[in-house]
Amino acid sequence: MATMHYLFFGILSVAVLFLGHAGTAAIREQDVPSGYTELRSADPLVEHGDAVAINDYIGSDLRKRIIDSAVQEIGVQEATGNNDGPRVAAYLRYVGLGKGYAWCAAFVSWCYGRAGRPLPRNAWCPALFPMARRYTAAQIGQGSIRQADLFAIYSSSLRRINHVGLVRQQKGNWIVTVEGNSANRGLPKRRPLATIYAFSNWLD
């Protein structure tokens, strides 16, 4: 009788162990949704928590991802009008600067980095328009400017390029832009082509 008693509990223990293992296996083998993608930020400042996180992007269109990054920053405003504030500081840190510097080129660089492009990465506006990357006058006239290309504004008093932003689209003799450090904030704008000094292409 004792033997039957132990045999019963032995069988019961094996059954419990088998069911427990099967349950665990079922949980482990649940299918991950086919559309699931785990993404990491291309911006090390965001990745390490030094800036406010914004959404990552799924998709293969790099130009669109760059503009999406910029559009999500529309409305960012300086804290006191002195090139400051947490988001502005994040853009400047991305190019190795502290607070207080003009940040339009840093903003453009940050948007490219956010989309996974290491270059350009420079706070100096003229550096974003090397001759090798500029569009020719003929190309501009043919409507070759594309989404996420860069535009430059020239300062006669400084005798150099002193503002840069992103082209969102070209509409005839106008461009629609997203730019940082415009009226102390991130803004969309419409600018006539005649006011643009140069365009550059960092993607092709």
What would you call each of these model-derived segments?
Residues A2-Y6, G10, G23-P33, V46, ...:
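Aromatic- and glycine-rich peptidoglycan recognition patches
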Residues G10-F18:
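Bacterial N-terminal signal peptides
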Residues V16, T24, G113-R114, L128:
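General secretory precursor processing signal
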Residues I27-E29, P33-R117:
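N-terminal capping segments
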Residues L62-D68, L97, R117-L187:
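...with weaker cross-activation on analogous glycine-rich loops/strands in unrelated enzymes
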